[in-house]
Swiss-Prot record, chain A:
Gene Ontology biological-process entries: regulation of transcription by RNA polymerase II
The keyword Nucleus is annotated on this UniProt entry: yes
Ranges for domain Cyclin N-terminal: 53-142
Any one GO CC term of the record: nucleus
Pfam families assigned to the protein according to its UniProt record, in alphabetical order: Cyclin_N
Gene source species: Aspergillus oryzae (strain ATCC 42149 / RIB 40) (Yellow koji mold)
Keywords, in A-Z order: Activator, Cyclin, Nucleus, Repressor, Transcription, Transcription regulation
Name this protein carries in UniProt: RNA polymerase II holoenzyme cyclin-like subunit
Domain of life: Eukaryota
Cell location: Nucleus
GO MF, one example: cyclin-dependent protein serine/threonine kinase regulator activity
Family matches, as InterPro entries: Cyclin-like_dom (IPR013763), Cyclin-like_sf (IPR036915), Cyclin/Ssn8 (IPR043198), Cyclin_N (IPR006671)
Gene: ssn8
Curated annotation (Swiss-Prot), chain B:
Gene3D superfamilies, per database record: Phosphorylase Kinase, domain 1, Transferase(Phosphotransferase) domain 1
CC terms in the record's Gene Ontology section: CKM complex; mediator complex
Residues that hold ATP according to the record: I32, S33, S34, G35, T36, Y37, G38, R39, V40, K56
Upper classification of the organism: Eukaryota, Fungi, Dikarya, Ascomycota, Pezizomycotina
GO terms classed as biological process: negative regulation of filamentous growth; negative regulation of transcription by RNA polymerase II; nuclear-transcribed mRNA catabolic process, non-stop decay; positive regulation of transcription by RNA polymerase II; protein destabilization
UniProt protein name: Serine/threonine-protein kinase SSN3
Length: 301, 413
């Protein structure tokens, strides 16, 4: 069913275990060791940060909504579970994922406009000819087996807002945590409602005041590392007198819901490590490594 | 110039060559139909793959002689995505999708019949009504499929007899999801996407009135029209479509609205409070004023229409399996309810006395039927076979990339 996650192709075909994902990536490395040593690339999460920033650039002038960008990010992830990045032109993949996601999320953009906009940003990597993007669209759809409907945690978040009487600040923070989870493998590893619950916990436990997201996530990482122990303890000990009532209410709700708490904790840890590695992010570095790879392998042709 | 230097052992992952070829897997036996999207062919499975298939080919755009990738239309993308996701006994079954030679081939199960063809058969050589139990089974299965779509947050938006497929074992399959879309909190209002939906004869009054926020109720109106057509063998509201003008503004469908009013009476704010805020309300008022008082019935004449329809069809007068009877009328009137907020839902319709009373409903709509329907027409020549008298469904609003490309090219010349 299109709107039912449990029967969706996302749950049936696009949910991986960590081990499976690692195996897939290792098999890419095995198959083309030369390329891997010749063209080292930054950590996948740093690349994801880079891709997401490029998508935001692309989307800005076309005033694309966040959900279409999120869908595009999921498409990119899915595509790279089937293709070694070193055999592709990532700029073309990013642009095509954007173009396709806009159509799927009902905010379509004309192919010529998308190509023109992409050439504004990366003239040396995107050909003026729209047929390249059209061809890449075929590759993307084919690798995804036409399974293009993506379920996002945003929906669960808005459904839970009244139930958990979340403040607008908390919702805003949870929303940006959800935005950030697209920078990790989490969308390939956990169902959207688990992500939403994780985002809500993070938002309620760590007040929005502590955070200015995107780029300067370090304070949050620290806060989460230290404070995270509290919530993890609270989750384990339902009779604990420790946490404030606000958090106790959330813990109570969690205990009654059938949400997989262990999965929620794993997601939180994944996010903490994202914020830690984010400190090493350098746009220039990503750009250089990708550029060198694309140019010397003629992947832009 | 640089292409020669590409290492052939490492093809670019963004280039595209199909892993599966249509002709390797399927033997095309003939041509079924064509539309704005492309063509449908009948095919047989090859190499041990049994069965018959209908292959829908979305046409690649031709710019000059060489076919180019021009970006897929949003309608194709939607149909591919939704059909890959959906799985229900009363929704057409997708076998696979093959992307090859810059075209898309959607491989569906083959269905021998559709409601348009069945209705047509009952007018030849003279009119003879579709048996009441068959109508009931068709409608039940249709609503069952529609309930599944609606609970999956999918609006079909183009229900009409030609899109209701029937297998040779009498199972109903809702087909052609080219206009279908998800309606759970869409990013843009549903109106802004496609300005015109639903083939005009089956278009709900709120769409004719220019409604911007329409709901699954539009599909239920279409089911009402189909129900009426199954009984009378003619479209109940056979209006003439006013064409879109050069400015691409959607005209008020005056003639179609008139056809509805002639049977259903003038809609008033008493029976449909929301009507006064509809964009075309003033058009409706001027339509009412343009005729002599009493020209349009003040109240619904649907019951009269229904009774004479049963009489002409030779349906039994006393209640029983031989007639849709009073329950059938009640259901029809709830489907053809002006106010979309009051119109019966698929769920409610399935629990209606029309289905509850009168014994079991067969999952084979042909059960107990002695007659035989002709097979689907499959031709060997690949010519366009357009059913000229049938108005098509407009797939506008979302500029099909390929069409836009062509238009702008023409402009330059």
């Amino acid at each position: 069913m299109a709107a039912n996650y449990w029967a969706s192709t996302q749950r049936r075909h696009w949910l991986f275990t960590k081990e499976r994902l690692a195996d897939i990536r290792e098999s890419f490395r095995e198959r083309d060791k030369a390329a891997h040593s010749q063209f080292p690339l930054p950590d996948q999460r740093l690349l994801n940060i880079y891709f997401s920033q490029q998508l935001i650039k692309l989307g800005k002038r076309m005033s694309t909504r966040q959900q279409a960008l999120a869908t595009a990010q999921v498409y990119i992830k899915r595509f790279y579970t089937k293709n070694e990045i070193r055999h592709t032109n990532p700029y073309l993949v990013v642009t095509t994922a954007f173009y396709l996601a806009c159509k799927m999320e009902e905010c379509p953009q004309h192919i010529r406009f998308v190509v023109a906009e992409a050439r504004n940003f990366w003239p040396e990597f995107i050909a003026p000819d729209v047929s390249k993007l059209g061809e890449c669209e075929f590759a993307l759809i084919s690798e995804m087996n036409s399974q293009l409907i993506v379920h996002h945690p945003y929906r669960t978040l808005s459904e839970l807002q009244p139930e958990l009487s979340l403040t607008s600040d908390e919702v805003a923070l949870a929303w940006s945590v959800i935005n950030d989870h697209y920078l990790t493998d989490l969308p390939l590893l956990y169902p959207p409602h688990v992500i939403a619950v994780m985002a809500i916990i993070v938002a309620v436990v760590f007040k929005p005041s502590q955070t200015s997201f995107h780029g300067t996530a370090a304070p949050l990482a620290g806060a989460m590392r230290d404070g995270g122990m509290n919530i993890l303890a609270a989750l384990g000990d339902k009779n604990g007198a420790g946490p404030p009532p606000r958090i106790q209410k959330l813990v109570g709700w969690l205990a009654e819901s059938e949400v997989d708490i262990r999965a929620v904790i794993e997601c939180t840890q994944e996010l903490v490590s994202l914020y830690e590695i984010w400190e090493n992010y350098s746009e220039k570095h990503c750009k250089e490594l990708l550029g060198r790879m694309v140019k010397s392998k003629n992947l832009d042709k | 110039m640089l292409k020669e230097h590409l290492d052939p052992r490492k093809p670019s992952g963004t280039g595209y060559t199909s892993k599966v070829r249509v002709r390797d897997k399927y033997h095309i036996v003939g041509f079924i139909s064509s539309g704005t999207y492309g063509r449908v062919y009948k095919a047989l499975g090859k190499n041990g793959q049994k069965g018959e298939f209908a292959i829908k080919k979305f046409k690649p755009d031709k710019e000059g002689e060489i076919i180019q990738y021009t970006g897929l239309s949003q309608s194709a993308i939607r149909e591919m995505a939704l059909c890959s996701e959906l799985d229900h006994a009363n929704v057409v079954q997708l076998e696979e999708i093959i992307l090859e030679d810059k075209a898309i081939f959607m491989v569906f199960e083959y269905t021998e019949h559709d409601l348009l063809q069945i209705i047509h058969h009952h007018t030849q050589p003279h009119r003879h009504a579709i048996p009441a139990p068959m109508v009931r089974s068709i409608l039940f299965q249709l609503l069952n499929g529609l309930l599944y779509l609606h609970t999956s947050w999918v609006l079909h938006r183009d229900l009409k007899p030609a899109n209701i497929l029937v297998t040779s074992s009498g199972a109903i399959r809702i087909g052609d999801l080219g206009l279908a879309r998800l309606f759970y909190k869409p990013l843009n209002s549903l109106f802004s996407g496609d300005k015109v939906v639903v083939t005009i004869w089956y278009r709900a009054p709120e769409l004719l009135m220019g409604s911007r926020h329409y709901t699954p109720a539009v599909d239920l109106w279409a089911v009402g029209c189909i129900f009426a057509e199954l009984l009378s063998l003619r479209p109940i509201f056979k209006g003439e479509e006013a064409k879109m003008d050069s400015k691409k503004t959607v005209p008020f469908q005056r003639n179609q609205m008139m056809k509805i009013i002639e049977i259903m009476g003038l809609p008033t704010k008493d029976i449909w409070p929301g009507i006064v805020s509809m964009p075309e309300y003033s058009q409706l008022q001027s339509l009412a004023m343009s005729r002599a008082p009493g020209h349009f019935p003040r109240s619904s004449n649907l019951e009269g229409w229904y009774q004479s329809c049963l009489k002409n069809g030779g349906y039994a007068t006393s209640s029983g399996a031989g007639t849709p009877g009073a329950d059938g009328y009640d259901l029809l009137s709830r489907l053809l309810e002006y106010d979309p907020t009051k119109r019966i839902t698929a769920q409610e319709a399935l629990e209606h006395p029309y289905f509850k009373n009168g014994g079991p409903i067969s999952a084979n709509c042909f059960e107990g039927f002695e007659g035989k329907y002709p097979h689907r027409r499959v031709t060997q020549d690949d010519n366009d076979i357009r059913s000229g008298s049938l108005p098509g469904t407009k797939r506008s609003g979302l500029p099909d990339d390929s069409l836009m490309g062509r238009a702008s090219k023409r402009l330059k010349e």
